[in-house]
Every structure is written in C-alpha cells, then in structure tokens.
C-alpha cells in the first residue's frame, strides 16, 4: 500500500525529539475525533528530515484539521529553535479537561529583538 502523508504547519524546530530520539508523542485529530482511523506518516514543513510519526493510526485527517501532539512537555519549548526564521508556537496545557495558554507564540519582532546593528 502507498504511504499517505499528513503535512502539518510545524516542524522539527518546534518539536525535535522525534527526529533526535525517535520519541513517541501520541497524535490526535481534535477536529475529527470520531472519524475512521487511517494510517498516516506525519511530516513537518522544514526541508530536512522532518518526520514526527511513521505509519501512525489517526482519525481521518482533512485539510485544516487541528492535530495535537500529546506530552510534548517542557522539552518542546526548551529544545525549540527559530531554524529557517520560523517563529516558535504558543504552548497550551490541558489540565482536568481545561485548556490553558501558558506561553504566547512568537511574533516577527521576536526574531529581531536581540540583533545588534553593526553598520
């Protein structure tokens, strides 16, 4: 059978652990939680080895669906980077079924704020 890829609006610059350590993060489709399960390879938007999961059962994914990567934890942010001038995403914590924003996403000015004018 053919490999079916799901491309997400993220990359290893946001969660590098799967690439470095082959770490497992459960991926769920929040937009279609009761859809039929399909087998997907989930890839990011960076031009390097940017694969989050191979041959993973996920409820059917459609364009625009929101996927969650479970248990990214503190290492998600601490190991993230602005590789290829990509902005860091917001972080949310789910506790007792409630979603809490715990870190705002970067804005373009965040990429430039520590640069020093040389010339």
Language model region names:
Residues 1-119:
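Charged (often Lys/Glu-rich) extended helix/loop segments that serve as interaction or gating elements
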């Amino acid at each position: 059978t053919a490999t079916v890829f799901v491309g997400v609006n993220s990359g290893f610059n946001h969660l590098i652990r799967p690439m470095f350590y082959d770490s497992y993060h459960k991926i769920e489709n929040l937009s279609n939680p009761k859809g039929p399960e399909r087998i997907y390879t989930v890839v990011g938007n960076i031009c390097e080895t940017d694969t989050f999961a191979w041959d993973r059962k996920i409820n059917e994914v459609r364009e625009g669906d929101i996927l969650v990567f479970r248990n990214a934890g503190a290492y998600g942010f601490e190991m993230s980077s602005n590789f290829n001038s990509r902005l860091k995403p917001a972080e949310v914590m789910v506790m007792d079924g409630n979603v809490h924003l715990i870190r705002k996403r970067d804005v373009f000015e965040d990429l430039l704020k520590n640069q020093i004018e040389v010339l």
